Amino acid sequence: MQEENFKVTRKEAQQLARIPGNVKGAVILANLEYVRQKGGKKAQEMIQKRLKELGYDISLQDIKPMNFYPEALSVLIILLAKEILKLDKAGIFEMGRLALKVSIFVEPLLRFFVSPLKCFQQAPRYWKKQLKVGELEAVKMDEEKKYAIIRVKGYKFHPLICDYHKGYFLQVAQTVLGKKNVEIEETKCVFKGDPYHEYIIRWQ
């Protein structure tokens, strides 16, 4: 269900800014592309305006895909997309999926891996290439029982990002497995008192 009155406050933006960690510009650009597809150029301009209101004096047009920027900025753009486009949890989930779909670096690379297991084992390395905050742990993959477990440790920005990551990880799994019938569930969450985020991916 949409939260019609959802609005990011300057206090929330300042709290995010104090959390350390960086992300590649390619991720931010992918999220801005989602905003453009859903709300057009006007929605992107509104995000730029709101960023300045919240104390982020950065030109979105100057973001380079291979440069690193604060993860707080990336998260704030996702929150502002929710605010401006009136997104629900499903919309945030789809934004996460699109982040992989429009990436000119990650999705094509994943398609080269013949073995889903090898890609699963390399997942922590890809996380480190994209994000300089937290870590991804490839816990277990059982190809016979058709499930995999991954954990994200040391990452706590905003509860909505759990839905974003679910969408991203689901798209990764569908790309690697070459299957459409894939499901994902977050079974542990730091915002619910757990020590890390844990996701179970199942497929048929």
Language model features with spans:
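Short terminal or interdomain "cap/linker" segment that borders an active site or interface and mediates
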Residues: 2-25, 128-166, 170, 174-204
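Amphipathic interaction/junction segments at domain boundaries or subunit interfaces
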Residues: 62-164, 181-182, 188
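N-terminal low-complexity or simple alpha-helical regulatory segments
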Residues: 2-101
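Short, mixed-charge aromatic SLiMs
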Residues: 51-60, 101-106, 188-200
